């Protein structure tokens, strides 16, 4: 396998991806934080940009797996910056779920299938 580390300009990494292969993107959560809060400010366009870049990448390899922490499901009252981040993360996950064939949530090692079917091993 090959490791490609990028926090910004994600589609530049496409040149390193085998179109017949599988990409594991870990993690959407860290990628959004890196793009949204660089230089001490808040880039409110980051969620849209990250979602678009990941959707574009997902069309390149045969299989694309994204890891995202579901911190937006907690129902807590957050400060404005955290609320913007959590909302942005939810936007990315909804965008990717609409794009992907399979959406699976793992909880305590157990899969919960939201969309599609798990591939046979």
Language-model features and meaning:
Residues 1-35, 43-44:
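Conserved nucleotide-sensing/catalytic segment adjacent to the nucleotide-binding pocket
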